[in-house]
Amino acid sequence: MLLDLNRFSFPVFLKEVRLLTTLALPMLLAQVAQVGIGFVDTVMAGGAGKEDLAAVALGSSAFATVYITFMGIMAALNPMIAQLYGAGKTDEVGETGRQGIWFGLFLGVFGMVLMWAAITPFRNWLTLSDYVEGTMAQYMLFTSLAMPAAMVHRALHAYTSSLNRPRLIMLVSFAAFVLNVPLNYIFVYGKFGMPALGGAGCGLATMAVFWFSALALWIYIAKENFFRPFGLTAKFGKPDWAVFKQIWKIGAPIGLSYFLEASAFSFIVFLIAPFGEDYVAAQQVGISLSGILYMIPQSVGSAGTVRIGFSLGRREFSRARYISGVSLVLGWMLAVITVLSLVLFRSPLVSMYNNDPAVLSIAATVLLFAGLFQPADFTQCIASYALRGYKVTKVPMFIHAAAFWGCGLLPGYLLAYRFNMGIYGFWTALIASLTIAAIALVWCLELCSREMVRSHKAV
């Protein structure tokens, strides 16, 4: 049977579901809070006007592409730390965490410079109003300053989640979400003596909450008794290029996979810009809601990575394979709920963002397409995270490259412009690309986990 789902009794299945849920739920709440920051940005910008909403859509797409790609690179720390923890190598856990912070800081500075360099080419390429382009440039400038803190936060995020302590991440994320609301209100609308920055104010608020999140999570770890034996904050460690090389070897394919998937969504915003601001605004609504729902498989997948990595560290290879299957089943059950939510409540969901009739009509149709790809999206996400627990990252990268670019973005462009399907051509191609990725990744997971069990039985 697929991933030996019939290997253990039903009580064992329920136990694994419970363990995955215990890990995934705080991660989900933390992810929802983080995506909620983007949701607040979208709502606040929409309140300032559809020009500001379009500017934030463009600017946040650029920021999200860099952030998500680099977040994928930092995700290498999860299987590294989880396997060390499972093997009982306490000192190595703390040292790997320290090197992760150094790596994240260097990566974040590079991301900041990269975003600065991208502002002028984006403005030269776009053909929108001066106000939209200027607001987008300001937004990108502010959010670029968040990149160093964002990557340090991701290192600390990986450290705490891999040690089965996701509750700290949840608490910090909710505090950041709460802080983001008044900051957006102040900066966007010009309250308490501050100038009204419009959509650019969303970027300034985002920068502030990322720095808050990194600092708060560091303080939590330093003061929590559970973390003291690992010694993350007990001493200062110099950068170790050998560890950096290991992080890069595992993380670079993950980062590229994230980029390929994110670009299939983010680049669409730029490609549909010639259709007008209504379509750009509607696309931002679809991306925002899809991003919120994507946190569900991402959280289940993250929990699966930790549980699989921990089991492999303990040399429980059959258990790791079984956990891979259980995480997929849990994801499929949750996917049914998200499909129904998007289809049945698409109109009220869209109205939370903007009341412009044209935007409402386009966005409501976009959500139908988003609902159709939920099962495939859940499957490919959780399967890729499970493979990550095995430190298998290159094959998923190639699968994502073929699926999202070969079967997604490029065909979507042809459907949109050559076959006159407009924005819906891109979403049609995305459904096909996600389905192909899901099938290929599950097949890869089946082979990889089976071979791991067989090879260690033979020893």
Curated annotation (Swiss-Prot):
The UniProt keywords, alphabetically, are: Antiport, Cell inner membrane, Cell membrane, Ion transport, Membrane, Transmembrane, Transmembrane helix, Transport
Does rRNA processing appear among the keywords? no
TM regions (residue ranges): 20-40, 53-73, 100-120, 132-152, 168-188, 202-222, 254-274, 286-306, 325-345, 358-378, 395-415, 423-443
One MF term from GO for this chain? xenobiotic transmembrane transporter activity
Intrachain disulfide bonds: none
Chief location bin? membrane
Which superkingdom is the protein from? Bacteria
- Which cellular component, as a GO term, is one annotated location? plasma membrane
CDD domains the record matches: MATE_NorM_like
Where does it localize? Cell inner membrane
Which Gene Ontology biological process is one annotated for this entry?
A: monoatomic ion transport
What is its membrane topology?
A: Multi-pass membrane protein
Q: Which InterPro entries match?
A: MATE_fam, MATE_MdtK, MdtK-like
Functionally, this protein is described as follows: Multidrug efflux pump.
Q: Which family does it belong to?
A: Belongs to the multi antimicrobial extrusion (MATE) (TC 2.A.66.1) family.
Quote the PANTHER family the UniProt record gives: FMN_FAD EXPORTER YEEO-RELATED, MULTIDRUG RESISTANCE PROTEIN NORM-RELATED
Q: What is this protein called?
A: Probable multidrug resistance protein NorM
